UniProtKB/Swiss-Prot annotation:
This is Flavodoxin. Its cofactor is FMN. GO terms for molecular function: electron transfer activity; FMN binding. PROSITE patterns: FLAVODOXIN, FLAVODOXIN_LIKE. It comes from Buchnera aphidicola subsp. Baizongia pistaciae (strain Bp). Keywords: Electron transport, Flavoprotein, FMN, Transport. Residues 4-166 form the Flavodoxin-like domain. It comes from the Bacteria. It holds the Pfam family Flavodoxin_1. The keyword ATP-binding does not apply. Low-potential electron donor to a number of redox enzymes. Belongs to the flavodoxin family.
Amino acid sequence: MESIGIFFGSDTGNTENVAKLIHKYIGTNISSIHDIANTNKKDIELFNILIFGVSTWYYGELQCDWDDFLPTLKKINFNNKIIALFGCGDQEDYSEYFCDGIGILYNVIRLSKNVRFIGSWTSKGYSFECSKALDKNKNFLGLVIDEDRQPEQSNQRIIQWTKKIKTELNSLLN
């Protein structure tokens, strides 16, 4: 399998911790992990398979490092790349903006031709009002983690999601 680049932005450490677990479960021999705060366009362009992790802040805003990186992200050509997304949010205190960061990244990346997204995730088991991270079938566009309200479910969700994206990758690449 090709090398996978995992890029995250984190203020509190939650998204970074999730990224580290994804790195572990995907396989440290086939993936590398990068803080978006220390990333440039060329770093991302090195990979054909990318996993982006973002948290949502305040009223549906991107984590600050992703917000700073957004102009660069818009310049990247994601043609023929495979993308998986994950995000952290608080479904109780920010129920009307739950994990919007995933949707914001998705809406930038999807503009490239032939980009393929993998790793959609069920919205069952979460309680929120609204999210830009939902697809037309009401599934999340990627893995959603709530370390504030459901920390006991995070590890199992990460394990299940990494198995899912490995299966999807094997199907696409073989």
